[in-house]
Amino acid sequence: MKTSEWIDISQPLNNDIATWPGDTPFSYEVSWSKEESGSVNVGKLTMSIHTGTHIDAPFHFDNEGKKVIDLDVQVYVGPARIIDVSNLESIGKKELENFHLEGVERLLLRTSSHGKANEFPDVIPHLRADIAPFLSEKGIRLIGVDVPSVDPLDDKELAAHHQLFKHGIHILENVVLDHVADGDYELIALPLALSDADGSPVRAVIRPI
């Protein structure tokens, strides 16, 4: 039987990609060309960790929180379910109660609210804090969203971030889901082995189960 092909659900990183207002712009350049070195091109990359498709570590919002290197990589690999939650201003327990989520460990939410990697949104659907205990009761260990944050963009309390990790749920942001159907997939979204970082870019891919 032919194995299904992997589907990329990552935002391509290039010099046009949007970043959080005031954060470090993405930049890639060849800093040492083949003509200069005589053998190879060597690139230089400058970026914020929270550009494009990425994961958050607790250190992002808690000075005492775990850093990327301390996170369990098993969480970012395995079966995942994509569900559609379009046309909602916020998402919490109430909005998810009618979905069958028993046995789901990784949940990706399609809000279809923005979808423009080169434009930072003015407002996004956000997760309410009551989603965390609900997801935890279902056994979910990772939540993914197709927007830059699980909290409102102008929020300073970051209640969803705090409650999700308090309940053992990891955060994946800025996945691209408009080109894939609802259903069950195998997910790989591994962070880099960054020792002191508050997050990491990932190449997120899925394939149907």
Swiss-Prot record:
PANTHER family: CYCLASE-LIKE PROTEIN 2, KYNURENINE FORMAMIDASE
Entries under InterPro entries matching the protein: KFase/CYL (IPR007325), KFase_sf (IPR037175), Kynurenine_formamidase_bac (IPR017484)
Reaction(s) catalysed (UniProt annotation): N-formyl-L-kynurenine + H2O = L-kynurenine + formate + H(+)
Lineage of origin: Bacteria, Bacillati, Bacillota, Bacilli, Bacillales
Cofactor note: Binds 2 zinc ions per subunit.
Gene Ontology biological process terms in this record: anthranilate metabolic process; L-tryptophan catabolic process to kynurenine
Family to which this protein belongs: Belongs to the Cyclase 1 superfamily. KynB family.
UniProt: Zn(2+) 1 binding residues: 50, 54, 56, 173
Protein known as: Kynurenine formamidase
